UniProtKB/Swiss-Prot annotation:
This is Beta-hexosaminidase. The record marks D174 as: Important for catalytic activity. The active site is at H176, D248. Signal peptide: none annotated. GO terms for molecular function: beta-N-acetylhexosaminidase activity. Plays a role in peptidoglycan recycling by cleaving the terminal beta-1,4-linked N-acetylglucosamine (GlcNAc) from peptide-linked peptidoglycan fragments, giving rise to free GlcNAc, anhydro-N-acetylmuramic acid and anhydro-N-acetylmuramic acid-linked peptides. GO terms for biological process: carbohydrate metabolic process; cell division; cell wall organization; peptidoglycan biosynthetic process; peptidoglycan turnover; regulation of cell shape. Gene3D superfamilies: Glycoside hydrolase, family 3, N-terminal domain. The keyword rRNA processing does not apply. Substrate binds at D62, R70, R133, K163, H164. It is found in: Cytoplasm. Keywords: Cell cycle, Cell division, Cell shape, Cell wall biogenesis/degradation, Cytoplasm, Glycosidase, Hydrolase, Peptidoglycan synthesis. It comes from Pectobacterium atrosepticum (strain SCRI 1043 / ATCC BAA-672) (Erwinia carotovora subsp. atroseptica). Its EC number is 3.2.1.52.
């Protein structure tokens, strides 16, 4: 299995998709809204992806809830992370977050999807890229809710990816469109943004981490996703993280400062990433596959889902019915809350 995760064009695989997925450097596929028409089509697409490679690829999606939910029709409308604590008592926020993590993961596993890149562990709501995707503006409260969400994901059989290390919440710029710079002192980043990552690593609750395409100017001239300081010195050595490190999508503008697509890929791997995402730019992905040195990434097999239930079994279960009702209600309350603020 190789270290490259990429995307496919549409609702079903075309000839180029199949050829790309057979490449020995490919280890995973990430799905987007453009890959989803309905539940039956999605199930068939995942089957095609499984059949296209000699390896069992890691199939992934961003199904966080709120504004980042790639699959909607036929799936529970999940509330934004901010909604849990914003509209409920602490104990109720934790209860609903655990059900949210479980239900999100279970609905994906029932489609034979291994991971949803969640949860977002960034602190605060001021960043354009993060906003309602963050659990809370206070690190301690964000941690309390995140722990419950993670417990739910794990109970369904899905591995957890915390993002975006060491914290994207304090920069207003959107790394999808530019390379944000965070000028704060390192001591502040460590005491505020990194607190949640440190706590979850110490309690061994994170299976994977995705770093930010943000330059922390007091630490390093490179974005964290291409920084050996952040990934090796801090994450591996100082915090003792031994899970999988993903790059965020190397086609985002935040990664452009790292050079051409092959240069970005090489920089991310050399900095300490185990798997690199190259999405929404097929030409860039192919140039990475053509130019990257052979790399084996067998540790990525740890990311496979552990569920063995069917979608019908899930939808018939009392837990799903109760969770679906509670989370749909919270999602509607959150939408009404936001509309009332405008």
């Amino acid at each position: 299995m190789g270290p490259v995760m990429l995307d496919v064009a549409s609702y079903e695989l075309d000839a180029e998709d199949r050829e790309v997925l057979e490449h020995p450097l490919v280890g995973g596929v990430i799905l987007f809204t453009r890959n989803f028409h309905d539940v039956a089509q999605l199930r068939e697409l995942v089957r095609q992806i499984r059949a296209a490679s000699h390896e069992r690829l890691v199939v992934s999606v961003d199904q966080e809830g709120g504004r980042v939910q790639r699959f909607r029709d036929g799936f529970t409308r999940l509330p934004a992370a901010q909604a849990f604590a914003a509209l409920n008592s602490v104990s109720e926020a934790q209860r609903l977050a655990e059900e949210g993590g479980w239900l999100m993961a279970a609905e994906m596993i029932a489609m034979d999807i291994d991971i949803s890149f969640a949860p977002v562990l960034d602190i605060g709501h001021q960043s354009a890229a993060i906003g309602e995707r963050s659990f809370h503006e206070q690190p301690e409260m964000a941690l309390a809710v995140a722990q419950s969400f993670i417990r739910g994901m794990h109970s369904a059989g899905m591995k957890v990816t915390g993002k975006h290390f060491p914290g994207h919440g304090a920069v207003s710029a959107d790394s999808h469109k530019e390379t944000p710079r965070d000028p704060r002192p390192l001591a502040e980043i460590r005491a505020h943004d990194m607190l949640i990552f440190k706590a979850l690593i110490q309690s061994q609750q994170l299976d994977a981490i995705m770093p930010a395409h943000v330059i922390y100017t007091e630490a390093d001239p490179h974005p964290a996703s291409g920084s050996s300081y952040w990934l090796k010195t801090v994450l591996r050595e100082e915090l003792g993280f031994d899970g999988i490190i993903f790059s965020d999508d190397l086609s985002m503008e935040g990664a452009a400062v790292m050079g051409s697509y092959p240069e970005r890929a090489q920089a991310a791997l050399q900095a300490g990433c185990d798997m690199i995402l190259v999405c929404n730019h097929r030409e860039g992905a192919i140039s990475v596959l053509d130019n990257l040195s052979p790399v084996k990434a067998e540790q990525l097999t740890r990311l496979y889902h552990q569920g063995s239930f069917s979608r019908r079994e899930l939808l018939d279960s009392p837990r799903w019915k109760l969770a679906n009702q509670a989370l749909t209600s919270l999602s509607e309350r959150w939408q009404a809350h936001k509309n009332g603020e405008k």
